[in-house]
Amino acid sequence: MADAQELIEVAAEVRQIICDLAEAPEIVQSARDGVRVAEDRLSRAEAAAYLESSGTVREREAHVTVHVAGLRDDVEVAKAALQYARDKSKSLETRLSGLQTLAGLLKTEMKL
């Protein structure tokens, strides 16, 4: 049989998730900004590397590839951070929904 303590624990977790969800849009936006900045740096570095190289088009492209590899990694890391932030937000929403259902069931059980 459900008791008040279980309901209190569920309510506390719901409050925490609501607080986390309130911060989620800022976290996602910050991650989006990180992707934009990383892509901008990569684009500028590619242009600069191409201009400072010489030779055939293939040689220039190879030069660019070598010189901006780290920045490409930075873009991928930024994209992964954005995806993580989105997934975390969805996970919190799902957990909140489950806890709200559980709270309703506990309340009903307590009334019986």
Protein language model regions, located:
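Short acidic DE-rich linear segments
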Residues: 1-2, 108-112
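Short, charge-rich amphipathic alpha-helices with coiled-coil/heptad character
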Residues: 1-24
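Long amphipathic alpha-helical coiled-coil segments
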Residues: 28, 32-35, 39, 75-106
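Extended alpha-helical coiled-coil "stalk/arm" regions
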Residues: 28-60
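A periodicity- and composition-biased signal for non-globular, repetitive helical segments
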Residues: 47, 64-66, 94, 101
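Short, glycine/alanine-rich amphipathic alpha-helical segment
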Residues: 54-81
